[in-house]
């Protein structure tokens, strides 16, 4: 059950991607602090923990340090998050979620529409175009799937 969010497990809609995160660190993280705006990915754990432990993170990893989010500091920008899966490739950048796939092109402002009910693709073609370009460039970087062997 994903509550107000669209989708569920194994889907790229918000309901399939959002995971609650609780951190307890007395004197560092405010006890009642809630942040439902910022997002981070599993690849961000290592560089963030390294930063908090004053350890240099490896240079050749995909994640970025997001420990400032955990500590309640306002963040200027987070790199876009990209996914490949059902219903097609997706990107989340700041307040925007863009999908391209089975349902055509979808664009949502998840800051005002976390349930992803109102497709804004026609109202914000310039936003959709920029996100589309990022998704297409990223997809070209991904390795091609290995073809299945022919049955004999």
Report residues per predicted region.
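Type III/flagellar export substrates
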Residues: 137-139
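C-terminal cap/loop subdomain of S1 sulfatases and analogous C-terminal strand-loop tails that border
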Residues: 1-17, 28-111, 141-147, 151
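Short glycine- and hydrophobic/aromatic-rich loop-to-beta-strand nucleating segment
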Residues: 21-24
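Substrate-binding clefts and catalytic carboxylate motifs of secreted carbohydrate-active enzymes
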Residues: 129
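Basic, alpha-helical interaction scaffolds
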Residues: 133
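Active-site-proximal N-terminal segment of extracellular/periplasmic enzymes that hydrolyze or transfer
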Residues: 118-126
